[in-house]
Amino acid sequence: MSGSDKTYQLDETTLYSVLNLKYGATEVQIRKAYMKLARELHPDKSKSEEAGELFKKVAHAHFILTDKKEKMKYDSKLLAKGLYDYSPRIPNDKSRQNGMFKDTAKNSKTFTNNNNKDDASADTSKSKPRKSRPYEEQPYGFGVDTGRGSGKNIPLFKTFNAKSYQNSKKSVTPPRPKQPSEKNKRATSFSNENRNSSSVPLAKNQAKKTANSGSAVGSESRISSSGSESSSNVNSATGSSEEPDVHTQHKMARKDSYLSGFQSKARSPESPFQDPAQRHFVRTKYVSSRYDKRSLSPVKTTPNSSTETLNNVKNIFNSMSDRLRHTLFGNSNGDAEDEDQHNTQHDTERLFKRAKLPGRKILTDEEIDEIVKQQNEAESNDPDRQDYGNSFNLNVDNLSVNTQDFNHISEPSPEKEETKANKAPFLEEVYEIKSDNEHLEEKAAVSPDDGIDTLGLNELGETLPNNKEPFDMRNVGDSLDNYQVKRMKVSPKPRSVPSKTTPGSSHAEENLQEPVNIPLPRIYKLDPIPIEKFNVDLSISNIKLPEMPNLLCNVLDKAQVLECQQKTAEFTKQTNETKRKLLHILSQRCSADEELHDKLYRVENVNRMVEAKLYDLELMTKLSELLNRQRMVAENYAIMINTMYASGLLEKN
């Protein structure tokens, strides 16, 4: 069948459907689907131009779905469009016979001879799975596909042969076990091809093989071969389906020599594994899975109580003290027993204090040489260094090592003394190891004001919290004042429908914690204005207006006229001073109103504003009265002067 006879189909709705997959397929599934389509649509495999264009779409879909960023973008688009649950419309492998294409030429071909019929039966037997049913369930009648290969092409006029039908069903039965003479034989593709190409039946070839091996008698083999020939001829004449089964045999997988060696051995009846290879695989898989889960911490198991935690802490400190002792004094092979006894005696409790040293000083080479000479002289002068109960001090500027409770250690070897003499210890942090008795004595002697914080293991056990006691979370919120917590925007309580109120009604009955559809009342803040800022001078009541002078006089008397003139001048002077004072107070009031314009009309300042306006009115009343008096005095004086002018007395004077 050529490439032009194939019609390819792809569901291009989504990139997943192009690869015949659903949304959410894994990378392995995408890779397998791409490789499967590439074998059919690649230009090197197919000569059709349509296949080349479809392969570009398949490659593009594979590129997008294998890139993590592009796949995330594409998946978000599918979720937005609602195509995440779309399934491809191309039929699956069970319903299609020829992959991604349809055989369009098979329906148009007609078979005229027996060879063409055999070829067509071979194609259908390859494409459709064989149906194996028991004898009682086999259907009979016209137009029924029994799935027996070439048997369905039997002419209608041919009679049914029960023996040939039974021989055709032999392929369904399990194969017979191999004979001892056939164990070393291997079925290869070459042997299968020879059996397929040769016209000799299968039973005849089997008889030849047994004759060559020499494992059977010649006469018996001839009898068996003749019998098999007759049976095979009957099968070929009746059109049995055994010969097509021989043609459809595939190449057998090569057996591994390593596994075959294990399989040859007898399996123990008590073993749950089929062979040693399976047991080896399971054990290797279990070990490799457990290898990455190993704990690297000194405490291998999680402690179940505070006592186990204390014991683990003790063991860690004891191992650190042993390492420190070994670095300072060494350890001989003969002291192993004493060291074990010491560990058992002092594993119960120990006190460890970290001595803080002053700032480290960098020593020169000359100072280091002097230190080494002093150490050598001290060791040469005191060869018997057995008592370690006192202390071991290296007094070098900023270095001090204090160790006690080492009476159990014997004298070190002279070789180790020489090696220690050549070393200048530079220790930045030193742990002091105390025994139980010394710890009690020092605890009684040291006062709490010494500034040294020591904590025994017993006290540590009392201070540590018990694992059985639950943690109290009630006071945790006190330390989270500045932490921003997202609160619910809507109260979980059911909403109450607010009643419709008029704009003038009060909102005192409304609950401010529940959302309402009416404007909430404002929280009003009072801002009163003191009376002093209004520039109201209460001393205005004490201001007295000048009295009007009496201008009644004898016009003919010159002295009386002059006296009236002086009284008028004094009155005018007094009224002008009072008027100037009243106008000054009024101007201050005007400026105060301008400054307090924003706050003047608030509720708490309205009454004060009324008082200020009354004050202004009082000022204006006094001012108007003063002006009225000035008018009246001026009119009287003008009448007097005009009378004198009319009489002619003014010209004479």
Swiss-Prot record:
Residues covered by the J domain: 14-78
Query: Per its UniProt record, what InterPro entries does this chain match?
Result: Diphthamide-biosynth_chaperone, DnaJ_domain, J_dom_sf
**Keyword terms:** Chaperone, Cytoplasm, Nucleus
Residue ranges, annotated region (Disordered): 85-308, 490-512
Q: Which PROSITE patterns match?
A: DNAJ_2
Q: Which GO cellular component terms are attached? A: cytoplasm; nucleus
Classification via Pfam families:
DnaJ
- Biased segments, Low complexity type: 213-241
Q: Where in the cell is it found?
A: Cytoplasm; Nucleus
Which coarse location class applies to the principal site listed for this UniProt protein?
cytoplasm
Cite the record's Polar residues compositional bias ranges.
161-171, 187-200, 298-308
Name under which the protein is recorded = J protein JJJ2
The source organism is Kluyveromyces lactis (strain ATCC 8585 / CBS 2359 / DSM 70799 / NBRC 1267 / NRRL Y-1140 / WM37) (Yeast)
Gene name of the record = JJJ2
